[in-house]
Regions:
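Interfacial transmembrane-helix starts/ends
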Residues: 50, 119-135, 139, 143-147, ...
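Interfacial/gating helices of multi-pass transporter permease domains
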Residues: 45-52, 56, 74-94, 160-163, ...
Length: 250
């Protein structure tokens, strides 16, 4: 116990020392390059930045609301073994989310280039690009499902019970990929407030449904992920199509 306290004390001192050093370096850099000066900055310049960025705060908090809330609710009603199986399935579905996010990094650049161009065939280009990325996402999801279905029972047989959960959560991950695709249009046209409203309130609904249904079965929790992700994607696609019809298709 004494050794543990000594180690903890040393780590605390080290962390505080690093924090002070980083703080001093930050102050030096700000003074050296005059980053504290706000000359020339006005409300008219700050306002569009705030209007674009502030709505993203609750938007980005939705992941914590959903997964953090689910973690506490599931831990309350189920054993550690059941929680571990479900968490493993959720982590597997996150692979699909990562695939969608990775491809979207490149795809978003192409979308912005088309939208900002003066081409006459913007709509046709975006349609072709959307079909192509849909095919990529579908192949990616099928590949992940196939690999996990084969390898998990062989390599990690104790986690084979997570596969039924994973199959449902994989569908939610596929919807997330579609969500990544269509949010690009909302970002481009500065509709982050609309995105915030959709994601934040869907997360609150997710939390309420989880508090109600999770106690009965973890399959209900998986279905909540699928259902609300579908609703969220449907709203984002609808809003994005309105923007495209207004600014691109006409």
């Amino acid at each position: 116990e004494i050794t543990t306290r000594l180690v903890g004390s040393e780590m605390c001192i080290r962390d505080r020392t690093c924090a002070v050093l980083y703080g001093l370096i930050a102050i030096y850099v700000c003074c050296r390059y005059r980053l504290f000066l706000f000359k020339g900055i006005s409300w008219f310049k700050i306002r569009p930045i705030l209007m674009w960025g502030v709505p993203l705060i609750p938007h980005l908090a939705t992941s914590w609301i959903k997964q953090g809330g689910d973690r506490y609710i599931i831990n309350y009603y189920y054993t550690f073994a059941e929680v571990g199986i479900f968490s493993f399935a959720l982590n597997l579905s996150n692979i699909i989310d990562m695939i969608g996010s990775a491809f979207n990094q490149t795809n978003s650049v192409s979308i912005y280039q088309v939208l900002s161009s003066n081409l006459d065939d913007k709509w046709e280009r975006l349609q072709r690009q959307t079909k192509a990325i849909f095919i990529v996402y579908t192949i990616g999801v099928v590949a992940v499902l196939a690999v996990c279905s084969i390898l998990i029972p062989l390599v990690l047989p104790r986690y084979a019970a997570s596969l039924p959960y994973f199959y449902l959560l994989a569908l939610s991950g596929y919807f997330q990929c579609i969500y990544f695709l269509y949010t690009n249009y909302l970002f481009y046209y500065d509709k982050t407030k609309d995105l915030m409203m959709i994601t934040f309130f869907s997360s609150l609904l997710h939390l309420m449904l989880s508090m109600w249904l999770t106690q009965y079965s973890l399959y209900y929790t998986c279905l909540i992920y699928v259902f609300l992700k579908f609703i969220m994607v449907a709203l984002v696609v609808y809003r994005a199509n309105l923007l495209l019809n207004k600014y691109v298709k006409t």
